[in-house]
A protein has these predicted regions:
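A composition-driven surface/loop motif
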Residues: 6-13, 20, 28-255
Length: 255
């Protein structure tokens, strides 16, 4: 299968350059049905239509992305938002909300959302976080449980981007852990763990640089722990660069 060969070549080339990695067998499975992994990712593109650009939803609360949110209590912790730098700070929150599709939804296609973590933070809902361009940093940690959709997702447009520089743990019962139609970067000693039905990471361009550990488990049949593609159809290989990082992958079939 041409698609499978392209994907295997790209991933194999990336893994060959790793300074340190550990593979759990079976790992990096070849998917014979790429649409399975893209089905819930498409939810992002469809549901964003008709929504007002420039809104930040946190649980059942809705805010304007150009208005500051002074520190306020939420979910047993506090949240705050700096509209000038578009920085959302979570400090020890435990937010469980299924009133919408996403616990945190940053609907601004022109702006990077800086998510800063302090303390231990927990999010649980249909989907975890959706944003077109997202950077996660801070000394805290984030645990996401998504019952219906992705743990962290873009909006389904080309150019979606995610950077993770903090500890993140994702459980996605019926979707991908991370799905972006663009780049995903894990860095700065971050530990990222995920257990999901579909792809652990599904993106066009993957970089893992100096991460403490990236541990991904995909439980679905014919699904990948890492699925790097160059287009929506999965017929073009994407790019993966991994170095100075420990990588542990488990999926349905061996590579």
């Amino acid at each position: 299968m041409k698609q499978g060969k392209l994907i295997r070549r790209a991933v194999s080339a990336a893994l060959a350059g790793c300074m340190m990695f550990t593979l759990s067998v079976p790992a990096l499975a070849e998917s014979t049905d790429a649409l399975m992994q893209l089905s819930t990712a498409a939810k992002s593109a469809v549901s964003v239509l008709g929504e007002k650009n420039g809104t930040l939803k946190i649980g059942n609360n809705s805010f304007d992305t150009e208005t500051n949110i002074n520190e306020q209590e939420l979910g047993g912790g506090t949240i705050s938002y700096d509209a000038e730098t578009h920085t959302l700070t979570l400090n020890g929150v435990n937010i469980e909300d299924s009133s919408g599709d996403w616990v945190i939804d940053f609907n601004d296609t022109d702006t990077l959302l800086n998510l800063v973590l302090m303390g231990e933070n927990l999010l649980k809902g249909k989907g975890g976080i959706r944003a077109h361009d997202l950077k996660i940093s801070g000394t805290g940690s984030l645990q996401i449980t998504a019952t219906n959709y992705e743990g962290i997702a873009g909006i389904g447009q080309s150019g979606d981007n995610l950077t993770i520089g903090s500890d993140v743990d994702i459980t996605a019962m019926n979707g991908c852990a991370i799905a972006f139609n663009g780049s995903v970067r894990i860095e700065q000693d971050a530990t990222v763990k995920a257990k999901c039905l579909y792809g652990g990471i599904d993106c066009y361009d993957l970089t893992i640089d100096s991460a403490t550990e990236v541990n991904l488990e995909s439980t679905g049949e014919q699904c990948n722990a890492i699925y790097v593609r160059g287009d929506n159809d999965g017929t073009v290989a994407g790019t993966a660069n991994i170095k100075n990082s420990k990588l542990v992958l488990k999926s349905d079939y061996p590579a």
